[in-house]
Amino acid sequence: MDLIYIPEDLSSCPKFGNKSCPPTNRSFRVRLIMYLLMTGAMVITIFGNLVIIISISHFKQLHSPTNFLILSMATTDFLLGFVIMPYSMVRSVESCWYFGDSFCKFHASFDMMLSLTSIFHLCSIAIDRFYAVCAPLHYTTTMTASMIKRLLFFCWAAPALFSFGLVLSEANVSGMQSYEILIACFNFCALTFNKFWGTILFTTCFFTPGSIMVGIYGKIFIVSRRHARALGNMPENTKGAGRNLSKKKDRKAAKTLGIVMGVFLACWLPCFLAVLIDPYLDYSTPIIVLDLLVWLGYFNSTCNPLIHGFFYPWFRKALEHIVSGKIFRSNSDTANLFPEAH
């Protein structure tokens, strides 16, 4: 999601003629390093999420309510890496927008939509995990196929309507005279918000889903620890392999959820705080800081497949099938990705 820095000195702005690029003092070496780092993040985002998309779509063993939510989120993160990040990279490195005003509005709208869609998916997955861990007896009757479809529809439709409606109507920049002058002067493309819409965006699109996620994952963590302690206190002669496996899974679930929550907050909290606070500081935050915050938010989509790779054995097994070409064999869709279950 884009942010903007509005410079105070617009005296050099041409009143007539072609728009120019904002001045930049970055050396070739600095730009090269930036391109390499951002390209690396893009490649991981695209191919990491593509592995998740192929795996869950192909292997029947992965067809579950939770994984369909993960599949949809991976699609969101893949689109962010494939459609949004390349243009954002050029804009961030060159400090200029070369792709026209019309595409600027589409890019800003789609960028905002995908960023919010990814956040809403994380919240939906938290709800799914809450019922699976804290109310397992009600899970199958609550998280039905119909419920998953409704969650997915909301995760995509609400951000799309909000993002495209806000950007195309230009309500987010209403009353911002300095922004209008900047756009008229330079080849510049960034998403910014006035005080009203900055507050609305922070409250509805970050604080609310973030609070829900923190509350849910906190509850899941407590329940998982309680299950682990209960299994640990049982007499040795009543423990079986299944109970030991359950204890291990509970601990792993609590650890994974903590990492997911920590990565989410680390990536998105600074960006949304800038959205909230910068309008009250007369948009004085340096552009290099805002660029860093934008890419930190993008990095959440880069981290999601990495988290799966480290903590979900099925991801590594599916990746092995894809890389080795086993996925092209007949009946490969029925391959067992959970050998420890047998």
From Swiss-Prot:
Ranges per topology, Cytoplasmic: 57-68, 169-172, 224-256, 308-342
Keyword list, A-Z: Cell membrane, Disulfide bond, G-protein coupled receptor, Glycoprotein, Membrane, Receptor, Transducer, Transmembrane, Transmembrane helix
Region spans: Extracellular Loop 2 (ECL2): 173-186
Main location: membrane
Cited InterPro entries: GPCR_Rhodpsn, GPCR_Rhodpsn_7TM, TAAR, TAAR_fam
Record's bilayer topology term: Multi-pass membrane protein
Record-annotated disulphide pairs: C21-C185, C104-C189
Segments on the Extracellular face: 1-35, 90-150, 194-198, 278-286
Glycosylated residues in this chain: N18, N25
Cell location: Cell membrane
Transmembrane portions of the chain: 36-56, 69-89, 151-168, 173-193, 199-223, 257-277, 287-307
Record GO cellular component, one term: plasma membrane
Any one GO BP annotation for this protein: sensory perception of chemical stimulus
Molecular function terms, GO-annotated: trace-amine receptor activity
Annotated domain remarks: In addition to the well known disulfide bond common to G-protein coupled receptor 1 family, trace amine-associated receptors (TAARs) contain an unique disulfide bond (Cys-21-Cys-185) connecting the N-terminus to the extracellular Loop 2 (ECL2), which is required for agonist-induced receptor activation.
Family membership: Belongs to the G-protein coupled receptor 1 family.
Function recorded in the entry: Olfactory receptor activated by several primary trace amines, including isoamylamine. Activated by isoamylamine and cyclohexylamine, but not to the corresponding alcohols, isoamylalcohol and cyclohexanol. This receptor is probably mediated by the G(s)-class of G-proteins which activate adenylate cyclase.
Protein name stated in the entry: Trace amine-associated receptor 3
Species of origin: Rattus norvegicus
